[in-house]
């Protein structure tokens, strides 16, 4: 099969995307595919029309890759691609919209408030601290910060609004971080994330030694997390592969955090770890996604 691996892009997650793309391209070549590695640029449509790929493996993270933009382009060009479609991608990258949907399904999610203007920030009466402040449409915990006071919240949110269109503040729920990989409509084993500091931020995700990971052995909790993940996945019409993040309190209450429609495929990535627990090595995982 002639496969284009699309990586890089212009989002703040460019470097992680390049790592994912290189790993995917290597696996595809070892599987016998004819592989082309392309960055996201203005010449992309022309390059794709020239190569005429059988499929595009989207290894882009964040803006333009996970928000439905490149999916829409590929649909216009009538080129099949991996992952969720334009609408599912656009919905899932929007943390505010996704939380509204998940809440409507009867699933717990931390309380939150979204700011679209300086006035929203200055007039907020948010009073739950500590709290998490982050961009609405970024991944890999880019821009995420824990704040301890209303003054700190306003200062950081105003700063973020200079760089992004919308910002949200979210209740900080004390508990354990869990993530569930979805592969072709099946929930993979649950991975527990143990960050060396209080929150699983960009540094903890992509710096060796900053987090520990283990397969959750609590069968009852695992089953519940998998059931919730499949419910969310089906409602959002996620395709091929995805990852859904949760926080579980010491009382066992489950809170949905966010959806990742193009989870990382680096040496520290969690979806390959979960797949390995099911007996799939990295090449097997990529083979399943591409078919």
UniProtKB/Swiss-Prot annotation:
Species of provenance: Aquifex aeolicus (strain VF5)
Family according to the record: Belongs to the D-alanine--D-alanine ligase family.
Entries under HAMAP family matching the protein: Dala_Dala_lig (MF_00047)
Protein location: Cytoplasm
Record note on cofactor: Binds 2 magnesium or manganese ions per subunit.
Protein name: D-alanine--D-alanine ligase
One GO CC term on file: cytoplasm
UniProt binding sites for Mg(2+) 2: 258, 260
Example of a GO MF term: ATP binding
Pfam families: Dala_Dala_lig_C (PF07478), Dala_Dala_lig_N (PF01820)
